[in-house]
Amino acid sequence: MSLISILSPLITSEGLDSRIKPSPKKDASTTTKPSLWKTTEFKFYYIAFLVVVPLMFYAGLQASSPENPNYARYERLLSQGWLFGRKVDNSDSQYRFFRDNFALLSVLMLVHTSIKRIVLYSTNITKLRFDLIFGLIFLVAAHGVNSIRILAHMLILYAIAHVLKNFRRIATISIWIYGISTLFINDNFRAYPFGNICSFLSPLDHWYRGIIPRWDVFFNFTLLRVLSYNLDFLERWENLQKKKSPSYESKEAKSAILLNERARLTAAHPIQDYSLMNYIAYVTYTPLFIAGPIITFNDYVYQSKHTLPSINFKFIFYYAVRFVIALLSMEFILHFLHVVAISKTKAWENDTPFQISMIGLFNLNIIWLKLLIPWRLFRLWALLDGIDTPENMIRCVDNNYSSLAFWRAWHRSYNKWVVRYIYIPLGGSKNRVLTSLAVFSFVAIWHDIELKLLLWGWLIVLFLLPEIFATQIFSHYTDAVWYRHVCAVGAVFNIWVMMIANLFGFCLGSDGTKKLLSDMFCTVSGFKFVILASVSLFIAVQIMFEIREEEKRHGIYLKC
């Protein structure tokens, strides 16, 4: 066995998700170009990488150094670390919650999977029944008496779907209206006293509130599963009335579904599988309850009855190794680059534009990692339990040049959910602007109930339009010698806009972004930095292009 074959599952997208596999299709979209890896042009790019990347880390280290005059301003946010005697930047509240509870989550993962295997082996209890019982126990342990609020929303939506099942369009609209309204209800009444609803419920106000009292924070993920069940049920009920038979009755069809995610999404289960018990088991499924990744109800039920080929030791082992690598990468960054604390205290006075930009860039990498690591832990947990969900992030945050592709690769299971339940039902590419507005409006509201986020969603649609139009215009010149380089120039502009927008929203804020832009365009050193950074981005984009071409040469056609 060669070294390449051993390392391949650790570096390829196929090693992340069994859904990504070589495709036999041959058409204009799959045509590949000769490899550029060994050309003189790319040898120059390799030299540039060897010079620029270390300089980027060095700039971040300088900004985080105890010798930096700004160090005293953010030192109070640092904690005692465990790597090389350095302090760790544990100031991000979201990742701190995960990091501080990592041991507890790991123990829970081992306990859950061990108990489940013992119970399934020694009793006649099915996977779905075990998930129901354990899920309810976990729900109460996590949210205490607030579990009643979650169950109330679940039951109301269940009732709407089943009462109006013979009127699919009315039922669907009603489900969406109430589903979205739950986000507003929770935002305004998450701690509304039970006693105010009915006096005899007042004792509930003094009961156990759970390990996670803020139940509403994680309800957004619960809502996606609740909507998935009810929409899948309505689709199945309508097909049943039209006498459509189950799609996996024959052995041939069953084999196809085992290998085809798209078929599993619409797998026509017996109507008895859409029971209240299975509904609760799915919504409260412990490994994915807190934050996903998202799997549809149809897919979950199918995988609970049939083991997919991806549930094997080799795939799960390599996935676990990739998780550990991501976890340790985050630890090294937090110990050596204190960029989160710097951003929180705005401790960048007299730093160069290059240093400030690296503070922002590594902040974006931390945001990516703080989402990727929990998602991979929960997906690993589900894999150990026999459920294969979509991988949420198949591209590094630094390996993106397209806004559209970035959206598809970032929170991928959520994107798949949105495509299935919003984008396609509203017409898909036939009404691209309208469906995009609907999609990003829901995405904005789902993330947080704020007008600025709704405006952010609409602005994203406006920002996507130039890329969509430019792609359509220049797609006729794909064979031209200059095409790749013109695309790279456009991609550099795209990256600048995406970086500045994300730095403004998530890292530097208005003050930091204004200072960065002022230093970049109003000083000689800043202008030099912009030129050199743009050249570096141009080189990076060329590498990104070739990575995707190499994937195509191996039959991998990703849209991101």
UniProtKB/Swiss-Prot annotation:
GO terms for molecular function: O-acyltransferase activity. It comes from the Eukaryota. Residues 1-43, 123-131, 186-276, 344-352, 507-526 are extracellular. Its main location: membrane. Disruption phenotype: Results in an increase in triglyceride (TG) synthesis with a concomitant decrease in phospholipid (PL) synthesis and exhibits an altered plasma membrane lipid composition. Shows defects in cell wall assembly and stability and abnormal cell wall morphology. Deficient in GPI anchor remodeling, mutant cells only contain the primary, unremodeled phosphatidylinositol (PI) and are unable to attach remodeled PI or ceramides to the anchor. Defective in sterol lipid distribution. The active site is at residue 447. The chain crosses the membrane at residues 44-64, 102-122, 132-152, 166-185, 277-297, 323-343, 353-373, 433-453, 454-474, 486-506, 527-547. Belongs to the membrane-bound acyltransferase family. Membrane-bound O-acyltransferase involved in the remodeling of glycosylphosphatidylinositol (GPI) anchors. Acts only on GPI-anchored proteins, but not on free GPI lipids. Acts as an acyltransferase for GPI anchors that adds C26 fatty acids to the sn2 position of lyso-PI-containing GPI anchors. PER1 first deacylates, GUP1 subsequently reacylates the anchor lipid, thus replacing a shorter fatty acid (C16:0 or C18:0) by C26:0. Also involved in lipid metabolism, having profound effects on sphingolipid-sterol-ordered domains integrity and assembly. This is Membrane-bound O-acyltransferase GUP1. It comes from Saccharomyces cerevisiae (strain ATCC 204508 / S288c) (Baker's yeast). The gene is GUP1.
